Regions:
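Short, structured motif recognition centered on aromatic/hydrophobic residues
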Residues: 39-47, 92, 122-126, 223-227, ...
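Short, low-complexity Pro/Thr/Gly
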Residues: 101-102, 123
């Protein structure tokens, strides 16, 4: 049996007594129930974009990450493009509605927020997790009051039918899915007709050719972490909810005082490398927006949530640790991609002495998501 409570904790943030009590109880019960051992790492990440944007986003990801276009699943309401690195890292399922007027629960989440509503179909939906016995996992989770879409609802939402999917979280608005697969089998999604879309393949090839020409292909590694922004009051319950749905454990939290926020990290209790199952990070303000005027505190995280809704903010791609002529790989990657017209927010921060160097891109024109590049030095596993 996996013991999720015996793994080391890091960070400097103090949590409430409520959180510490229920964290221990939740993980102990999850371990004893067998759920921790039945649920594995992240199999796939689901992203939705506006009609007409998926092909250009494939080209963007082909340049900025190790992902490559594999196939397209052509179903009644969507084109779902499967992007893959290999079977040792999660897939990306990139969904594009065929009809700009298409409406579902995910669009309704965007419609609630002033900036999110401008791109009603563009959002990160959530993760699909590997599991050993999907029906048993769902049964146990339903007993613990987690709610799932019925098969008929999945068909109406035009989602893979071999995946059980939770209702969107009230705290993060993300979903969690479970997919059963023998570890030596490839991932297969029971969804639509499997085709190779010529324009998607051409976009991928264009991005990969540029990546090769710029000399950055060998510097880019799989996803390091996925960062979701949430309201300040939902920090602890969002963590508990994700730990209840997954086999992750609470790695720890750091206060980011100058930003009036905290970075809260969960990782695989099976101690899988992040390249196999990325860390899940939750960022929240330390104080709600309604009192910021009293202390004149910054509020970038809460402002984002108020504009877009609780949702994934960025996907962090790891950059291999190394230098060329005294320059870190991350600086070479950023210079090369910036030279192709991609914007970045501020400069890289951190250093080899601090253990980490990172930078954020501007939001994608095609998905609204940000790519973070992170280069860790030596065995440093922390966060800024």
């Amino acid at each position: 049996m996996t013991y999720s409570t015996r793994l080391p904790r890091y960070g400097d943030k103090t949590n409430s007594a409520f959180f510490e009590e229920y964290l221990q109880r939740l993980l102990e019960e999850r371990d004893k129930s067998g759920l921790t051992d039945m649920i594995g790492g992240i199999e796939a990440m689901l992203i939705s974009v506006e009609p007409g944007n998926s092909v250009e986003y494939i080209a963007e990801l082909a340049l900025m990450s190790p992902y490559e276009y594999l196939v397209t699943l052509d179903s009644e309401k969507h084109l779902t493009h499967v992007l893959r690195i290999d079977m040792n890292s999660p897939d990306i399922l990139l969904r594009e509605p065929k009809d700009v007027k298409h409406s579902d629960i995910f669009r309704s989440l965007n419609d609630l927020y002033p900036v999110g509503s401008r791109r009603p179909h563009s959002r990160y939906l959530g993760e699909i997790l590997h599991c050993k016995d999907r029906h048993q996992v769902v049964s146990l989770q339903q007993q613990r009051e987690f709610r799932f879409f019925q098969v008929g609802q999945l068909a109406e939402l035009d989602l893979p039918l071999n995946v059980s999917i939770s209702k969107p979280s009230p705290y993060t608005q993300n979903i969690v899915g479970y997919m059963e697969r023998q570890t030596d089998n490839i991932r297969v999604y029971q969804h639509g007709n499997c085709i190779i879309l010529p324009q998607a393949q051409a976009a991928n090839d264009r991005g990969k050719e540029m990546q090769e020409r710029l000399g950055i292909k060998d510097f880019l590694c799989p996803v390091d972490h996925l960062a979701t922004r949430i309201y300040s009051q939902n920090r602890e319950v969002a963590l508990l909810e994700y730990l209840g749905l997954s086999s992750y454990y609470y790695w720890g939290s750091y206060d980011i005082t100058d930003q009036n926020s905290s970075t809260n990290v969960t990782k695989s209790a099976h101690e899988l490398q992040e390249s196999r199952s990325p860390a899940k990070v939750f960022t929240a303000n330390n104080h709600p927006y309604c009192v910021n005027h009293l202390d004149q505190l910054p509020s970038p995280t809460e402002n984002f949530v108020r504009n877009y809704g609780p949702r994934l903010h960025h996907i962090a791609v790891e950059v291999k640790d190394g230098q060329v002529n005294g320059r870190e790989y991350i600086d070479l990657v950023v210079d090369a991609i910036a030279g192709q017209g991609k914007g970045f927010l501020l400069e890289t921060i951190g250093s080899r002495n601090e253990g980490l160097k990172q930078i954020f891109s501007s939001a994608s024109d095609f998905s609204s998501l940000i790519i973070e590049y992170v280069q860790r030095f030596g065995d440093f596993q922390g966060f800024f």
